[in-house]
Each structure stands twice: as C-alpha cells, then as structure tokens.
Amino acid sequence: MLAKRIVPCLDIKDGKTVKGINFVNFRDAGDPVELGAQYSREGADELVYLDITASHEGRKTFTELVKQVAAHISIPFTVGGGINELKDVDRLLSAGADKVSINSAALRNPALIEEIAKNFGSQVCVVAIDANFENNDWLCYLNGGRVPTDKYLFQWASEAESRGAGEILFTSMTHDGVKDGYANDALATLADTLHIPVIASGGAGKMEHFRDTFSNGKAGAALAASVFHFGEIRISDLKQYLKDEGINVRI
C-alpha cells in the first residue's frame, strides 16, 4: 500500500508567503523557499505553491521563485495559479516544478487536461476542485470559490480522470478554515469512484483530522496550511503520531 503523504500548501503573493507565519529564527518569515526547506527538513512528502497574484509581473516573480525552490528543495513540489495554457505549464516545469495544479482553467476548458497529459504525462497534471456542499450535493466553484458552476464534484472528478488527470486535489469550501476535520464522506466517495490518488484539503485543525482523512476518507494525501505555518502542528510529530496510529507514512 502506498505511503500516505503530508503536503503543506503555501499561498504566494508577489514572491512572499501570505498566510501569517511565526517560525522563530526566520530572517524573513514570508520567504517561501526558506519555509519550504524547513518543511522538507521536518519530513513533508511534497509541497504545493499557489500563485495568488493575477498580474503579469506576479507571474514572472513566481517563475523566478519556482527556480529558487527547485534549487533548494529536494522533495517534489506542485505549482498552481494562473495556468491557462500549455506554455504556462512548460514555463513552470522548465523552472523546476514537478507537477502543475489547474482549477478554474480546467473547468472552463476541460481539453486542457488532455493537452497537459498528452504533452507532459498524466503524473504532471493535478486537477484542483473547490466544491461547496449545498442542496445535498457538492457544487464546484471557479475563481477561488467565488463563482458557482454547473458542475458537481463527483462527475467532474470522474471526467477529469478520464481526460488524463493524475491526481485530484479536493478542497471542501464547507470545511476550509474551520479546523473541524476534512470532508471525509465526500473524500471516501471520491476514492471509491476514481482510480487516481485524491488529495484532501480544507479542515485540518489537529493530528486526529489527518488520521481520520486517511482511514475514513481514504485520501492518498492530506494538504494543510495554517496548522503548519503557525506552528500548531510539527510535521515530524504528526508523522510519528500517524505511524503510532497504524497509518503507513514515511518517517
């Protein structure tokens, strides 16, 4: 059985990590390379860097950052934000990223998934889905959760897989930031429906939440941000806890 992965996520704006961070001894608390290196040392399996700057200037800054991350960090990392066409993918992979995450662009143009898979391989293509539980179903949203679509989580995830996605990164908008645990029922349904790994996102508040999303939610990986950035959970402690709970993780 594949080892379960712990994946810190860093939101990047103008080259800086934007969620407040209070690790001690950081010369620059917002330095995403420094932070990524710290997580790597603590035992993170992968990293996700999301570019939340929309400007052309921001894109260039982000590409430079990807080069820096690739030069300093040995674990795989995924980049997302503002990826709309193949040349964006090419630029970021050439800068050193291992995978790209597409969200709104895939909903607007599902053929982009096939293009990425065909040109770079399915393993490069992570389809991120933001969905909110409403009227007894999981509705997918665009633009960072601001614009509702006519797509629903399970059918869209299946379509993404059939088009060549290598992984699904599912963020529950219902659970995000609440720190009350992941959307494990929906995650388990996804895991049973799909043949590719599912990354759980949204809801991590304590170590038990990671255990539950791996055992009950059947997630292949768990992504979190603030619990790591604010030092509430150390990754090395989390890994040991999960191992003690019988979850297969790399220590």
Swiss-Prot record:
CDD domains named among the record's database cross-references: HisF (cd04731)
Gene Ontology biological process: L-histidine biosynthetic process
Active site location: D11, D130
GO CC annotation terms, alphabetical: cytoplasm
Subcellular location: Cytoplasm
Role this protein plays: IGPS catalyzes the conversion of PRFAR and glutamine to IGP, AICAR and glutamate. The HisF subunit catalyzes the cyclization activity that produces IGP and AICAR from PRFAR using the ammonia provided by the HisH subunit.
Full protein name: Imidazole glycerol phosphate synthase subunit HisF
Classification of source organism: Bacteria, Pseudomonadati, Bacteroidota, Bacteroidia, Bacteroidales
